[in-house]
Amino acid sequence: MKKNPKISLIGSGNIGGTLAHLISLRNLGDIVLFDVAEGVPQGKALDLMQAGTIAGSDIKIKGTNDYKDIEGSDAIIITAGLPRKPGISRDDLISINTGIMKNVAENVKKYAPDAFVIVITNPLDVMVYVMLKESGLPHNKVIGMAGVLDSSRFNLFLAEEFKVSVSNVNSTVLGGHGDAMVPLARYSTISGVPIPDLIKMGLSSNKNIEKIIDRTRNGGGEIVALLKTGSAYYAPAASAIEMLEAYLKDKRQILTCAAYLQGEYGVNDLYVGVPIIIGKEGVIKVVELQLTKEEKALFDKSVEGVKKLLDTIK
């Protein structure tokens, strides 16, 4: 009998709990739910296992406060850290969450050095860099959840604008996972037709698309302002699951993620959101899009923002 993959979730808050539920429903593997708060991962694990009996899932879920339980993990998703709250930007979280990420990285290095690691903790582009450098894992096995989520928001707003199914929309968002991200209308389509062509057909306007791009950039902040006590968790969890599944099932799927760049897009030694192919080796290839001068300028501005943020912790 084939052994289930072992998936460890570091952080058992809203995203961690949602991740565990989705993994169980999709039967992706057995789960270790870790948190420093005593009782929280254990309680959620028991609740989720009981929910699994209704769904007919035999996935095993263990709640723990001991890092040793992540030993031998095939994949790890990290959500540990302070979430955003109203008035707090992703960047304000940097000093506290850097300390948390360093501790997580040490334990990943110790107990699961062969794992594929997905980081969700904000500020994302810096946290995933810290994970890489502190853990010593190969860069193709450490990525950040960014573009899949940003594209999902762009997809929704475009579907609403054109009054079509979200399944007809395919969008691309590059750059840092922050307010300077770069939603690319030229590389976004409705049933294969690029957005600029649809504008020429009179189905929308440049003004409307610019509003949608601005809303996409502030997508996380919009939810933080509405919730008042936290940040988004359903969509971030669903985005990470898509990345996890591409790895576990060797799908060789193109997804936009925060990936480590070594010259691609003219960027070195930095994590930035770009399209990558994900399969059983982790990051198989970085896909380099041909950008116009204007698009490249926006991308470079976003990259500069990531660099400045990273400089504050170096």
UniProtKB/Swiss-Prot annotation:
Keyword annotations from UniProtKB, A to Z: NAD, Oxidoreductase, Tricarboxylic acid cycle
Entry-linked Gene3D superfamilies: Lactate dehydrogenase/glycoside hydrolase, family 4, C-terminal, NAD(P)-binding Rossmann-like Domain
Active site: 177 (proton acceptor)
Family annotation (CDD domains): LDH-like_MDH
Reactions it catalyzes: (S)-malate + NAD(+) = oxaloacetate + NADH + H(+)
Enzyme Commission number(s) of this protein: 1.1.1.37
Molecular function in Gene Ontology: L-lactate dehydrogenase activity; L-malate dehydrogenase (NAD+) activity
Residues reported in the UniProt entry to bind substrate: 84, 90, 122, 153
Binding site for NAD(+): 11-16, 35, 97, 120-122
Gene Ontology process terms (BP): lactate metabolic process; tricarboxylic acid cycle
Family listed: Belongs to the LDH/MDH superfamily. MDH type 3 family.
PANTHER family per UniProt: L-2-HYDROXYCARBOXYLATE DEHYDROGENASE (NAD(P)(+)), L-LACTATE DEHYDROGENASE
Function: Catalyzes the reversible oxidation of malate to oxaloacetate.
Protein name from the UniProt record: Malate dehydrogenase
Organism name: Rickettsia felis (strain ATCC VR-1525 / URRWXCal2)
